[in-house]
Amino acid sequence: MPRPRPPFPAVKGLWGKPTIVNNVETLACVPYILREGAAEFASCGTEKSKGTKVFALGGKVNNVGLVEIPMGTTLRELIYDIGGGIPDGKKFKAIQTGGPSGGCLTEKDLDEPIDFDNLVARGSMMGSGGAIVMDEDNCMVDVAKFYMEFICDESCGKCSPCRIGTKRMLEILTRITEGNGTMQDLEELEELGQTVKANSLCALGQTAANPIISTLTHFRHEYLAHIQDKTCPAKVCKHLMTYAIDQDKCVGCARCAKFCPVDAIAKTDRKSTRLNSSHQVL
């Protein structure tokens, strides 16, 4: 369970002794450094971020999988040179780095070198090395909601800002994706995000709002479309979808009505049918 810090584990950790806490990827670099020397390891990478980094590249790219790249590689190189670009000629929209609590970066960030400081400065992080690419068919409000669902499930519940704050943010995102959002919801999301970030005990809560803050920063127009226009530009949020029968193509055969499980389709005359939106199954 997380606890207030300081003291940090490096000062007082296991059994009250100084303790090193690192992930497996960091520890895996130790044998190479001992064998080849620090200078050899530091010859690769950037001034402040040495060596290589393993990314789990996924999402809307042609080549998915684990890739090891030198620090300083650009996001464009990662997506297009290594990942093979976006399938089906779709347009790139965003890349989310760092795992579930990382931020979403946009086209203007593609030529920035990948290192620890650079990603943080742009509202994301290196984290566990996740890299999820999104194209024009992704709804960024739905993306933020997806990651917030995961973060809520993973919260240990010890500190109130994370336990309660993430749930409130998820409730707001759910409300927006269902067409019930208000402009005040955007203000509350930003305020809650900063509160959770500043007052949570561990890194999960401190970074939990990254998906929300970054999408609000770069894709506020999508939030506004959900709230003001009651539409999802990417056509992902099912509660904001409406269906209609193309009267120019309908011949009035009513074959479609026979297969509708809720009788949402009614025949009006010999040449047309009508769709009752109140009966639609979403």
Give short role names for the model-derived ranges:
Residues 86-121, 217:
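Terminal amphipathic helices with adjacent charged low-complexity linkers/tails
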